[in-house]
Amino acid sequence: MKFLSLLLLVGVAQAIVPPREPRPPTGGGKKLLTYKECVPRATLAPRSTSLAWINSDEDGQYISQSDDGALILQNIVTNTNKTLVAADKVPKGFYDYWIKPDLTAVLWATNYTKQYRHSYFANYFILDIEKGSLTPLAEDQSGDIQYAQWNPVDNSIAYVRGNDLYVWNSGKTKRITENGGPDTFNGVPDWVYEEEIFGDRFALWFSPDGEYLAYLRFNETGVPTYTVPYYKNKQKIAPAYPRELEIRYPKVSAKNPTVQFHLLNLASSEETSIPVTAFPEDDLIIGEVAWLSSGHDSVAFRAFNRVQDTEKIVNVKVGSKESKVIRERDGTDGWIDNLLSMSYIGKVNGKEYYVDISDASGWAHLYLYPVDGGKEIALTKGEWEVTAILKVDTKSKLIYFTSTKFHSTTRHVYSVSYDTKVMTPLVNDREAAYYSASFSAKGGYYILSYQGPNVPYQELYSVKDKKKPIKTITSNDALIEKLKDYKLPKITFFEIKLPSGESLNVMQRLPPNFNPFKKYPVLFTPYGGPGAQEVSQAWKALDFKAYITSDPELEYVTWTVDNRGTGFKGRKFRSTVTKRLGFLEPQDQVFAAKEILKNRWADKDHVGMWGWSYGGFLTAKTMETDSGVFTFGMSTAPVSDFRLYDSMYTERYMKTVELNADGYSETAVHKTDGFKNLKGHYLIQHGTGDDNVHFQNSAVLSNTLMNGGVTPDRLTTQWFTDSDHGVRYDNDSTFQYKQLTKMVYDQKQPRPQTTPLHQWSKRVLAALFGEEAEE
């Protein structure tokens, strides 16, 4: 909501003309992409518009922000707009805002300070729209409030400060908990729950009628601490002693934070702890909380065992505070993903249901489940997957969702009636494309976002007329005009079949002036992690990968291959990597490399790989195979040993060390012959301030390679002082991409037939090549 455009509902409804062709753009001009246009971020990029739909009595209202900063209330039905908050009432430098449901107040976040990937600290202020007065949420706040949220019904706000829960109501604040501190979190997740379970910064949920609040309490007592040093700490002159950030970070088989489920009666402030007996305390993860009623009768939570291959849905009856398991599943053939997809439906044929996504059939599909337990009702089926629930419209008895029905690399928007089970596409689902949609509060309108493979656009529709848009929200016509001057890399998508029968999705970029009679170096660019997807029909940024394909001095062909274990091709395809990360994935990349080398234009002497995070790990494991196919590699922020990574991610796929000791030993990068035998070079890059994949991984990897005899002409390790997992501190990203570019340039050059001998290298060369060493 931080970057909103003013949308004026004027003029005649217009669709995108001409329609986008179902392929990535190639340009049509003569200009080639330059380094400055692509690195470190793409400057030739599509824009998108975010809308804040308003949940009011009248559907089709949303908030946008004008050029002068004012908040504008737009009404699709009446084709009007009005100023809700004048520009001079908007706090300077605000980070985010939330409109009170009755449109009488705005909650502003200011003085933003980033914490982890999703979380931040801020000051919060309440603007009374009618009076124009601005009131601090807490009088003594000092940029230390962790989270705040409006009650969906009344004038109250739940917020978290110092890991304690508070409720503000019409100017009066009540402290709900008093045990918050460094090891106890109320209503907000700790690091590992934020990063690996919720993917968000809150752990509290108002009931639909606003009368109750469900929240989680996390206790990190006994969870080991990892210390991240900050050598510069954003100071001009480095402090003599680095600042040390201590994070409770559970690694594999270490103690996890414990979690408790609580209910708060907002009228009486009565707080109740609900016993969780689904799993023992030290074997419990709560992955999702959802209200299963239109009021506050029932609330459910999704419980997993520690290694996330067993799931139990627990329903709590708020009145009696009694709970029972209403659904459970054994997923020990792999793991069970936490899709955060439970949503209350209401009564169907006299029985209350909720909708959820499950891949128990082997493919992720929509099911209705009885709130009180019982047999599910399948709403979708087939060898394709539902990827997200977009909206539940209980009035029309429709569920809107995205799926891979056309192909695993595509996304199309559909509705399914939970009354008739009839499935209807909202878009042309017979061509390769990638769509999503954002629905108004009551489901009468939606913004359809075409996200690729061609230049993205957004259109506004009524659900009553899915063929003709009300208007185009974002056309990106200016970008299309600019791209007409360019000759862009040619992107194609295809599949290659493994000897075992599975097919792998591949995305190929060819240089703009590709000549099949020339030789071209090749760079593989995988991510390859469990359940992930890189090869999709979504828009491909004109970034570093596009640049190295375009530059006449480089002209790399790039291949991105989604190996076994990646997502959206069914449970069996995903689960095959269980307990053996880094085993099948490099085999698939090597197989793909052998396939590309069947092309006469592929230069077998210059085949590299670059990956980030899991992709960096996969790059290292692929070099480790000593296949003779890859000649160089580049790993950015790699995991090198999953015993060094967090428990909730790793154990989902690898289980615990006690259950899989040999698997962990094999998963770690530990063999060095493949690195020693590279014709080219191996580069490691890592930020020392990485709180996710710790710098420890690259430190250990470098040590392993050096002790294993990898020579300086084969290995470079580059650290980035205080940079996090995204390498964003100071000018680090600029240096990083210059280094990567120099690497791919150097690695495509002809290699000398003989290596010069020096006093410092004779013994090493003798060991490598069997030559007699001189004393």
UniProtKB/Swiss-Prot annotation:
Uppermost EC category: hydrolase
Catalysed reaction, written as an equation: Release of an N-terminal dipeptide, Xaa-Yaa-|-Zaa-, from a polypeptide, preferentially when Yaa is Pro, provided Zaa is neither Pro nor hydroxyproline
Keywords from the named record: Aminopeptidase, Glycoprotein, Hydrolase, Protease, Secreted, Serine protease, Signal, Virulence
Signal peptide: 1-15
Stretches of the chain forming a coiled coil according to its record: none
Keyword Hydrolase among record annotations: yes
Gene3D superfamilies: alpha/beta hydrolase, Dipeptidylpeptidase IV, N-terminal domain
InterPro entries with a match to the protein in the record: AB_hydrolase_fold, Pept_S9_AS, Peptidase_S9_cat, Peptidase_S9B_N, Serine_Prot_S9B/DPPIV
EC number: 3.4.14.5
Glycosylation: residue positions: N81, N111, N219, N731
Keyword DNA-binding: no
Active-site residue numbers: S613 (charge relay system), D690 (charge relay system), H725 (charge relay system)
Entry's Gene Ontology molecular function annotations: aminopeptidase activity; dipeptidyl-peptidase activity; serine-type endopeptidase activity
Function text: Extracellular dipeptidyl-peptidase which removes N-terminal dipeptides sequentially from polypeptides having unsubstituted N-termini provided that the penultimate residue is proline. Contributes to pathogenicity.
Family, as annotated: Belongs to the peptidase S9B family.
Protein name (Swiss-Prot/TrEMBL): Dipeptidyl peptidase 4
Species whose genome carries this gene: Arthroderma otae (strain ATCC MYA-4605 / CBS 113480)
Gene name for this UniProt entry: DPP4
